Amino acid sequence: MATFDKVKDIVVDQLGVDEDQVTMEANFTEDLEADSLDIVELIMAMEEEFDMEISDEEAEKMSTVGDVVNYIEQNQ
């Protein structure tokens, strides 16, 4: 499964949004209505799924689904 598909599944599961809302350009807070706790939980789920650690500093830079996908692909 491609990185985007895995990330999309996690976002749909964690935020309860429709799959078609989750695009590379979708902003977590503006488009997907995630709050700060949702984002922390998303990052934790990504770390578990991809067996990696994402620093708080890096997590703060991630505002879109594409940001997360690109970070994972560059750091796996």
Curated annotation (Swiss-Prot):
UniProt KW keywords: Cytoplasm, Fatty acid biosynthesis, Fatty acid metabolism, Lipid biosynthesis, Lipid metabolism, Phosphopantetheine, Phosphoprotein
Entry PTM: 4'-phosphopantetheine is transferred from CoA to a specific serine of apo-ACP by AcpS. This modification is essential for activity because fatty acids are bound in thioester linkage to the sulfhydryl of the prosthetic group.
Domain Carrier positions: 1-76
GO BP terms in the entry: lipid A biosynthetic process
Pfam families: PP-binding
Cellular component, GO, one term: cytosol
Residue numbers carrying O-(pantetheine 4'-phosphoryl)serine: 36
Subcellular location: Cytoplasm
Pathway assignment: Lipid metabolism; fatty acid biosynthesis
Disulfide bond as UniProt keyword: no
Record-level Gene Ontology MF annotations: acyl binding; acyl carrier activity
Cited function: Carrier of the growing fatty acid chain in fatty acid biosynthesis.
Protein family per UniProt: Belongs to the acyl carrier protein (ACP) family.
Name the UniProt record assigns to this protein: Acyl carrier protein
Gene: acpP
